[in-house]
Design a protein with these regions (language model features):
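Active-site-flanking segments in enzyme catalytic domains
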Residues: 5, 9-208
Length: 208
């Protein structure tokens, strides 16, 4: 699939080691194209919909899956992005030491912080939530998923079913996606992470 090609990983990464279940035409709410359900690890796409939502929802699934691989204190339904931010506040050393985790940590720092203070990206999302009286866009897992999908849309390989609407439209105009410079740095962190993960897994499979 295009996501596998972009990330340069084997299929087991896309399926999250076979733990990710796909559901079509079930669940969700009115107007929802796609959603991820941590309980059961289900990625659901609405019938005749879901276009442009797959990368966003897949990252939610990845964010959930990787939490226990990245942090010692991960509960079953927690996201790595949220745990990373919580650990910055509590200053707890709970991240497993590994180069791949360092790439993810750098990406989360890019999303949430500017020189140790809340990032401009976060401040825009928080202001939008305050105006709409709804806490959603500034949630760590939502900021991370929007960042990931925009990084993918900026790449040469285009797939409007995978991602769409991150470079134009109301959400983009409202500043709910990363600035260009931030997105470019995130691309470096995330693509390096997945390329290194893919290489390590291919070597492991080749040794079997």
């Amino acid at each position: 699939c295009d996501l596998q090609t972009i990330l340069q990983v084997p299929t087991q990464v896309i399926s999250l080691n076979g733990s990710l279940a796909l559901s079509f035409g079930t669940g969700g709410s009115r107007g929802t194209c796609a959603f991820y359900q941590p309980q059961g690890r289900v990625l659901a796409l609405a019938k005749n919909a879901g276009g442009g939502s797959l990368a966003h929802e897949w990252f939610h699934a990845f964010d959930h899956y990787i939490a226990s691989k990245m942090f010692k204190n991960a509960a079953p339904v927690q996201f790595a992005s949220r745990l990373w931010l919580q650990n910055q506040v509590t200053d707890k050393e709970t991240m497993y030491s590994h180069q791949l985790n360092n790439w993810l940590s750098a990406a989360f720092a890019e999303i949430f912080l500017d020189a140790g203070a809340p990032s401009a990206f976060f401040l825009r999302a928080r202001a939008f939530d305050a105006k709409s009286q709804r806490r959603y866009y500034a949630l760590p897992e939502e900021m991370a998923a929007r960042s990931f999908e925009q990084v993918l849309q900026r790449l040469p390989l285009q797939n409007r079913f995978l991602v769409d609407g991150t470079l134009a439209g109301p959400a983009f105009e409202a500043g709910l996606y990363p600035e260009t410079a931030r997105a470019e740095r995130l691309a470096c962190y995330w693509l390096s992470y997945f390329q290194q993960l893919g290489t390590a897994l291919e070597l492991k499979l080749g040794a079997v």
